[in-house]
Amino acid sequence: VHLTGEEKSAVAALWGKVNVDEVGGEALGRLLVVYPWTQRFFESFGALSTPDAVMGNPKVKAHGKKVLGAFSDGLAHLDNLKGTFAQLSELHCDKLHVDPENFRLLGNVLVCVLARNFGKEFTPQVQAAFQKVVAGVATALAHKYH
């Protein structure tokens, strides 16, 4: 992912304020509610039958935290996203058989959650930088599929 110095600074500044536990759970929960077909990868998580059940599910929250932890690692290695996510790409491709389109969907949901959480601070410029990052992460996670 190619970001300008200004974009890298904007991403780092905002990400430093992100509560990974809360935002991760909300982003994954929203993915499962907005795109219900993604729930098939999380059948072991139990109750996912209603939006409230999904958003309140402790396993969804815990996995969302884990996902955002990996995303944080990616932010520390923006110049080597494919290497950073190589093992996760292989896991999601070979063992979990996740549709790589889901990575793009989750990235876009994450951007929505950041906008909701940060309001005016999430300027169009900050959004543009984050869109580049989530697109780069989605591409890196889909790398083993090609």
Swiss-Prot record:
Effect of residue 9 to A: In one allele
UniProt binding sites for heme b: 63, 92
Pfam families (UniProt xref): Globin
Any one cellular-component term (Gene Ontology): hemoglobin complex
Residue ranges of every copy of the Globin domain listed in the record: 2-146
Metal-binding is among the record's keywords: yes
GO biological process, one term: hydrogen peroxide catabolic process
Iron in keyword set: yes
Source species, domain of life: Eukaryota
Stated family: Belongs to the globin family.
Protein name, per record: Hemoglobin subunit delta
Organism: Ateles fusciceps (Brown-headed spider monkey)
UniProt gene name: HBD
